[in-house]
Amino acid sequence: MAFSYCSSSLFVSLLLVILFISPLSQRPSVKAENHLISEICPKTRNPSLCLQALESDPRSASKDLKGLGQFSIDIAQASAKQTSKIIASLTNQATDPKLKGRYETCSENYADAIDSLGQAKQFLTSGDYNSLNIYASAAFDGAGTCEDSFEGPPNIPTQLHQADLKLEDLCDIVLVISNLLPGSK
C-alpha cells in the first residue's frame, strides 16, 4: 500500500511539474517592435522582407537607427556568405565551361560584395554615412552583376536567382537606413 501511495504521489508531482513547465515552453515568439522599423521598411523595395529581417531579433526593438544599420549589414553579409557557398557548390558541379565561367564571375562578385559590406560597417561605425551608402550600393551591384552574367542560356539556377534578389533587397535596407541617418547626403 505504501508503494502505491508513493507511486501516485510521484505521478501527481510529475504531472504538476509538466503542467507548470509546458505553458512556459510554448511562449509565442517575441517580435521586435520599433517605430524606426515601420519608418524604414515601407521605403524599401521589399517591405515584407525588411520587416521579417529587422524583426527577427528581439533586440531590434531597442536599437536606434545606427544599431538597425549595423544589424541590417550583418544580415546582408551573412546572406552574401551563404550565397558564396551555394556558388562554390554550383561551380564544383558544373561541367559546361560557359556555366562554370558564369559561376566564377558570381563568386568574384560575391567576394567583392562581402568586402563592401565589411567596409560599409566600418563607415557606419565612424559616422561616414555617404561612404556607407557607396559601399552598400557596391554590394547591391555585386548581386545584380552576377544576375546579369546569365543573359542567355544556360539560365541562372532558381536558387541563385533568389539569393541574388535577396541580397539586393537586404542591401536596399542598408541604403534606406543610410539615407535616414543624420548628415547623409
From Swiss-Prot:
One of its GO terms (molecular function) is pectinesterase inhibitor activity. CDD domains: PMEI (cd15797). Disulfide bonds join C41-C50, C106-C146. It is found in: Cytoplasm. It comes from the Eukaryota. Its main location: cytoplasm. Fruit. Residues 185 form a propeptide. GO terms for cellular component: cytoplasm. Residues 1-32 form the signal peptide. Keywords: Cytoplasm, Disulfide bond, Signal. Gene3D superfamilies: Invertase/pectin methylesterase inhibitor family protein (1.20.140.40). InterPro entries: Invertase/methylesterase_inhib (IPR035513), PCW_Enzyme_Inhibitor (IPR052421), Pectinesterase_inhib_dom (IPR006501), PMEI_plant (IPR034086). Pfam families: PMEI (PF04043). Inhibits pectin methylesterase; may be involved in the regulation of fruit ripening. Belongs to the PMEI family. This is Pectinesterase inhibitor. It comes from Actinidia deliciosa (Kiwi). The gene is PMEI.
